[in-house]
Amino acid sequence: VPLSTVGFLVTAFAGVYAISTPIITTLTSNWNRYKLLMLLMTVFFIGNTLTAMAPTLGWLLFARIITAAVAGTIISLINLLVSIITPMDKRPMVLAWVGAGFSIASVIGVPLGTTIATLLSWHDSFWIISGLTLIVFALLAWLTPRDTPQVKGSILEQLALLKNHRVLLGIGITVAVLSLQYTFYTYVRPLITTVMSFSLTSLNWLLLLLGVMSIIGNEIAGIVASHNGVQKLPIVFILMTILSLVLGIALGNKITGMLVLAALCVVVIIYGTTIQLVFISVAEKEYPQSLALATSLISIFANVGISLGSFTASTTVNFANLTMLGYVGAVYGLLAIGLSFALRRFYRK
């Protein structure tokens, strides 16, 4: 299969994920959450099983669309249920652990899936995912509360959440941070191998290191969110912007280049739990009918930031070399700083 076709499959998955998540989340917000989660997990299992069986590219595309259509809503629902059943004082760290779970899945899942595909076939990778899905399904069926408090509302009543200034600032911050991250992360492989001259054999280990840094970032995110996180966001984003600005110079040396990349992979994650809590707390207090939508906002607008950052990166390398990516990404860092100061003012009133 040509690389361009693989790229199309990835783009199609991301596009369907971004579009379907708010639609399905909003349309199903009045359903029983336990039954909805079981239904979505069933569809997820079917999508991955069809992927494992795919004999043609068209079949594969159809199967990935099925999976993408429900993946975002499943994540949103998990975050929602976690926020409901977790005591308020433990909520930041538990949400951070949920985020760390996704990072761990990426860090371990991607190289493991690649290894299985190399030793056996990519079909076998998806058969294993289907098997794991059945195990997770059984655990969720056992542990998930059958009934949780929920306030029902029409689609327009749910969308009223998007009028709130704190929510809009949180959305802007999410887009800005992910845009900065993917301005450099889109080309992280050539940054490591071409600019810093690491060998191809070192690449996977260094990518694993960056993944571990993301997991550490999730844990720090929980600590920051537990200690008045909104007030600390400007400091986090100032550090993030400084690291982005020095990246170009740091890439001239292997050690400093990897240290700055590793630090960036930690810092760009720290905002997440705090912003998730902003969305949830605003919904709980002012828009209880929008709670399901609130828990999906980060995953929705993260995709917007990823797309914007990737576009920025590809445009930059058409006119400049890879070492300029950090300087360009810092523009998004400045935007995040400004938005975080505005958000902090709302919480100081």
Regions found by a protein language model. Give the residues of each.
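Helix-breaking motifs and short loop linkers at transmembrane-helix boundaries and internal kinks
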Residues: 32, 53-59, 70, 197, ...
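Cytoplasmic helix-loop-helix junction between adjacent transmembrane helices
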Residues: 57, 63-102
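Conserved MFS/SLC helix-loop-helix module at the cytosolic interface between two early adjacent transmembrane helices
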Residues: 19-55
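Extracytoplasmic gate region of multi-pass secondary transporters
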Residues: 168-208
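Helix-to-loop junctions at the C-terminal end of transmembrane segments
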Residues: 21-32, 218-229, 317
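Helix-loop-helix hairpin linking two adjacent transmembrane segments in secondary transporters
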Residues: 59, 87-144, 187-194
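A late C-terminal transmembrane helix in Major Facilitator Superfamily
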Residues: 282-320
